[in-house]
């Protein structure tokens, strides 16, 4: 009996020891896992700080970024003297500013209500005035050159009269040329002989010249004298 008791006690003791050992191992394992997680977080934290990224959760980070963006835009607006306005108010104010700017431009160019004043005439009036100015300018030119009603004065003769005068001047000039060279009615005077007479005279002169040459060399009838 004593042996059995001792063996049971030993088994129980060994069971307790093994159970405690298992618990210890389990605890150590959990601690190791926790340490690994902590080390991982620490390592990631160190990396984030090394690259100037603070440790923040994703949601908080997004929220903070949005808040910072809004605050930054608000600071810019205050820095430039623009108070914070709601989007609807901003759109309304932009429309009002656009209308005011267009109104100012219209007044600056003396345009009210989209209708041009005397300073700016309508296209139709401008066309009419341009036509009137063109007519007035042509009328002034016509008076400047002594031309009234499209009819030329004595200062400027009509094309037909000019052509007639040109023909008369041409005839007078040809007549003067004919008188200058003693030619009247197309018939040459004694001063200028006709071509036929000139040819006859040339033949006579040629014969006389040949006769003179023959006498100069004492050759008569083509036969040499005793000389």
Swiss-Prot record:
Transmembrane parts of this sequence: none
One Gene Ontology term from the biological process aspect of the record: defense response
Location of this chain's protein in the cell: Secreted
Residues of the signal peptide: 1-20
Pfam family, one: FSAP_sig_propep
D-alanine (Ala) sites (modified residues): 50, 79, 108, 144, 180, 216
Composition skew (Acidic residues), residue ranges: 30-39, 62-72, 88-98, 124-134, 160-170, 196-206
Positions of the propeptide segment: 21-46, 57-75, 86-104, 115-140, 151-176, 187-212, 223-227
Top-rank taxon: Eukaryota
Keyword Chloroplast applies: no
UniProt main location, coarse: secreted
Compositional bias segments (type: Basic and acidic residues): 73-87, 99-108, 135-144, 171-180, 207-216
Disordered: annotated segments: 22-227
Function, as annotated: Deltorphin is a heptapeptide with a very potent opiate-like activity. Has high affinity and selectivity for delta-type opioid receptors. The two dermorphin-like peptides have a similar affinity and selectivity for the mu opioid receptor as dermorphin.
Protein name from the UniProt record: [D-Ala2]-deltorphins
Organism for this UniProt entry: Phyllomedusa bicolor
């Amino acid at each position: 009996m004593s042996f059995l008791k001792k063996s049971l006690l030993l088994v129980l003791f060994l069971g307790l020891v093994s159970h405690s050992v298992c618990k210890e191992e389990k605890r150590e394992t959990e601690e190791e896992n926790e340490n690994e997680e902590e080390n991982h977080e620490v390592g990631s934290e160190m990396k984030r700080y090394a690259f100037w990224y603070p440790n923040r959760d994703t949601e908080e980070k997004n929220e903070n970024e949005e808040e910072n963006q809004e605050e930054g835009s608000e600071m810019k607006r205050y820095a430039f003297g623009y108070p914070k306005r709601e989007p609807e108010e901003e759109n309304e104010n932009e429309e009002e500013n656009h209308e005011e700017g267009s109104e100012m431009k219209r007044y600056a160019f003396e345009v009210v209500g989209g209708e041009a004043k005397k300073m700016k005439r309508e296209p139709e009036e401008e066309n009419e005035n341009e036509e009137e100015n063109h007519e007035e300018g042509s009328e002034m030119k016509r008076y400047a050159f002594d031309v009234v009603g499209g009819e030329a004065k004595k200062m400027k003769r009509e094309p037909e009269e000019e052509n007639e005068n040109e023909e008369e001047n041409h005839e007078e000039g040809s007549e003067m040329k004919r008188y200058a060279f003693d030619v009247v009615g197309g018939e040459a005077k004694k001063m200028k002989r006709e071509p036929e007479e000139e040819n006859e005279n040339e033949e006579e002169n040629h014969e006389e010249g040949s006769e003179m040459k023959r006498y100069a060399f004492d050759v008569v009838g083509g036969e040499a004298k005793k000389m």
